[in-house]
Amino acid sequence: MKPFTVLDAIVAPLDRANVDTDAIIPKQFLKSIKRSGFGPNLFDEWRYLDVGQPGQDCSNRPKNPDFVLNQARYQGAQVLLARDNFGCGSSREHAPWALEDYGFRVIIAPSFADIFFNNSFKNGLLPIKLDAAELDVLFQQCEATEGYRLKVDLAAQTITRPDGKAIAFDVDPFRKECLLNGWDDIGLTLRHADKIRDFEAKRRAEHPYYFA
């Protein structure tokens, strides 16, 4: 997993509440268990005017010109502003996979669905809960300013606006450490590889019949 330290990036505003996981990545794309390749189908039913299918070349599909991610000013965005209850609906790890594969590293919203919130940290996304009034200001500034950027400093736990105002946010210390170091569940386990090998060797010596 790629470490997250400081991100200074373009922001895209998704001004919708209760964005569920089926909107983030529709059900027909869940057959694959690869973590990559979902970016072109992120928000598929909103981004395109047709119905997408797995394996389809999205480059020639008709796009919805009104959808935020299809607007030129938001190309390359790595920070997504959202509204309440982002990531609700059915549990699917494909949702953070699709957001990360598209290029997003940070999602800022007043609240998140619990399972999506937890899955995001495990897949290199930083979900930030921000007060709705503070978030309203970010939406207003973003929509009024082309090329609007935010600086997110995980170590300092701050979001810095273009006008220089720093906004503090909370993050669980363990999740923060994992993101800063790029540790997913496998990475955390491999940190103890020597102890695991020692335990296995000891167990094999003490109970050889288990391994016969």
UniProtKB/Swiss-Prot annotation:
Cross-referenced Pfam families: Aconitase_C (PF00694)
Gene Ontology CC, one term: 3-isopropylmalate dehydratase complex
Disulfide bonds: none
Entry keyword set: Amino-acid biosynthesis, Branched-chain amino acid biosynthesis, Leucine biosynthesis, Lyase
Signal sequence, start to end: none
Gene3D superfamilies: Aconitase, domain 4 (3.20.19.10)
EC number: 4.2.1.33
The protein's enzyme class: lyase
SUPFAM superfamilies in the record: LeuD/IlvD-like (SSF52016)
GO MF assignments: 3-isopropylmalate dehydratase activity
Pathway annotation from the record: Amino-acid biosynthesis; L-leucine biosynthesis; L-leucine from 3-methyl-2-oxobutanoate: step 2/4
Residues forming coiled coils: none
The keyword Heme is annotated on this UniProt entry: no
Catalytic activity annotation: (2R,3S)-3-isopropylmalate = (2S)-2-isopropylmalate
Family label: Belongs to the LeuD family. LeuD type 1 subfamily.
Subunit record text: Heterodimer of LeuC and LeuD.
Function: Catalyzes the isomerization between 2-isopropylmalate and 3-isopropylmalate, via the formation of 2-isopropylmaleate.
PANTHER family for this protein: 3-ISOPROPYLMALATE DEHYDRATASE SMALL SUBUNIT, 3-ISOPROPYLMALATE DEHYDRATASE SMALL SUBUNIT 2-RELATED-RELATED
UniProt-recorded name of the protein: 3-isopropylmalate dehydratase small subunit
Gene behind the chain: leuD
